[in-house]
Amino acid sequence: MAAAGGGGAAAGRTYSFKVVLLGEGCVGKTSLVLRYCENKFNDKHITTLQASFLTKKLNIGGKRVNLAIWDTAGQERFHALGPIYYRDSNGAILVYDITDEDSFQKVKNWVKELRKMLGNEICLCIVGNKVDLEKERHVSIQEAESYAESVGAKHYHTSAKQNKGIEELFLDLCKRMIETAQVDERAKGNGSSQPGAARRGVQIIDDEPQAQSVGGGCCSSG
């Protein structure tokens, strides 16, 4: 759900966005979130059970952004719970391990599911994680980037271990979500019917202080 806080020019608004991370177990989803929100990294593999979330506050070009980042379990037995966590999401980060071809193929299944449930309004990021293991790569960069382009997503390379590409990933996603929210707001102002915007709950609200970060379980290193 996205909410844009009123009270002045657009540049001074606060946007609240929900972002969900999806992907197989062991690809490093939780490591990415912990590195981004708390600048922490743990080599140990601790499995995420169902889902957890962290929050992050940013200021992008004078626009305040509150992110609620949902980290979901990658195990197959939790797959059916996916819709509970990604409904009303403004952005989705689909993570694969560059050393694991199967994890990349599973990303394609998530993309199909998200497009079916949420249409084209959700901003998609496809992320090749663990680039610190480049010598063990089994997913070609060209293949991954070509696929991302074909489904209207953007492709990124990250390493939670080396803290590479993570800030850029989230910053770019936030900018894209702001642009989408502004388009929805203009459409509402013009009296246009926007089913997608209504589904995601884009609305103008008064600014309210957001709660401090709430941490949950972990996933894999990388």
UniProtKB/Swiss-Prot annotation:
Could you tell me the membrane topology recorded for this protein? Lipid-anchor
Q: Where in the cell is it found?
A: Endoplasmic reticulum membrane; Golgi apparatus, trans-Golgi network; Golgi apparatus membrane; Early endosome membrane
Asked if the record carries the keyword Membrane, the reply is: yes
- The UniProt annotation puts motif Switch 1 at 40-53
Task: Answer whether the UniProt record assigns the keyword Magnesium to this protein.
Answer: yes
Alphabetical GO CC annotations of the entry are: axon cytoplasm; cleavage furrow; cytoplasmic side of early endosome membrane; cytoplasmic side of plasma membrane; early endosome; endomembrane system; endoplasmic reticulum membrane; Golgi cisterna membrane
Q: Which residues bind Mg(2+)?
A: 30, 48, 71
Keyword list (alphabetical) reads: Acetylation, Cell projection, Cytoplasmic vesicle, Endoplasmic reticulum, Endosome, Golgi apparatus, GTP-binding, Hydrolase, Lipoprotein, Magnesium, Membrane, Metal-binding, Methylation, Nucleotide-binding, Prenylation, Protein transport, Transport
User: What are its E.C. numbers?
Assistant: 3.6.5.2
What regulates the activity here?
Answer: Regulated by guanine nucleotide exchange factors (GEFs) including ANKRD27 and RABGEF1, which promote the exchange of bound GDP for free GTP. Regulated by GTPase activating proteins (GAPs) which increase the GTP hydrolysis activity. Inhibited by GDP dissociation inhibitors (GDIs).
List the ranges annotated as motif Switch 2. 73-91
Name positions with the PTM N-acetylalanine.
2
Q: Which CDD domains does the entry link to?
A: Rab21
* Listed cofactors: Mg(2+)
Family, per the entry? Belongs to the small GTPase superfamily. Rab family.
Q: Which PANTHER family match?
A: PTHR47978
Biological function? The small GTPases Rab are key regulators of intracellular membrane trafficking, from the formation of transport vesicles to their fusion with membranes. Rabs cycle between an inactive GDP-bound form and an active GTP-bound form that is able to recruit to membranes different sets of downstream effectors directly responsible for vesicle formation, movement, tethering and fusion. RAB21 is involved in membrane trafficking control. Regulates integrin internalization and recycling, but does not influence the traffic of endosomally translocated receptors in general.
Tell me what this protein is called.
Answer: Ras-related protein Rab-21
Query: What is the organism field in this record?
Result: Bos taurus (Bovine)
What gene is behind this protein?
RAB21
